Amino acid sequence: MKFFTDLLPVLLFFGAYWLTRDMFVATGVAIAATAVMVAWAWFKHRKVDTMQWISLGLIVVLGGATLLLHDKHFIMWKPTVLYWVMGAGLLISEFAGKNGLRLMMGKQIEMPDPVWRKLTWAWSGFFAFMGALNLFVAYHFSEDVWVNFKLFGGMGLMLLFVIAQSLFLAKYIEEKK
């Protein structure tokens, strides 16, 4: 359920864009949807995940700049900044001696430290790649292509990467009896 609620602002952005073909309307919808998502998380759980706060901050700042300056490039940077923040966060936690992935998944998977490090570097590299790829698509293709890439390309590549990581991690995942 959390995955769907986190994805909802992206889906509403996509829907608003394809209904209106207006990046500014879609941006306003994404800002509102993200604010509602964070408010709902707070109302329901009395807690908001760090990534939801970061996403809200980015959409308000970059989406707000898009609307105020009437420049779509600010909103096009949002996925890149989010990917790079996530990748940097993983690396910073690794260098600080607290593997971020282990903190998130350590209860489900028991692995040696070198494997956690490899996984952290793989995810950080993937996020760096995705951020750069988003900018490449944003600046070298049409607005329509970028909007489609934001939903389908980004999600498709993420799914492929998760499958590849799952195959790598399969030997460490214990079956529940």
From Swiss-Prot:
Alphabetized UniProt keyword annotations: Cell inner membrane, Cell membrane, Membrane, Transmembrane, Transmembrane helix
GO-annotated cellular components: plasma membrane
This protein's record includes keyword Cytoplasm: no
Main location (coarse class): membrane
InterPro entries reported in the protein's UniProt record: YciB (IPR006008)
Residues spanning the membrane: 23-43, 50-70, 73-93, 119-139, 149-169
A Pfam cross-reference name: IspA
Membrane topology: Multi-pass membrane protein
Annotated signal peptide: none
Subcellular location: Cell inner membrane
Presence of keyword Transmembrane helix: yes
UniProt-listed HAMAP family: YciB (MF_00189)
Family the UniProt entry places it in: Belongs to the YciB family.
Free-text function comment from the UniProt entry: Plays a role in cell envelope biogenesis, maintenance of cell envelope integrity and membrane homeostasis.
Record's protein name: Inner membrane-spanning protein YciB
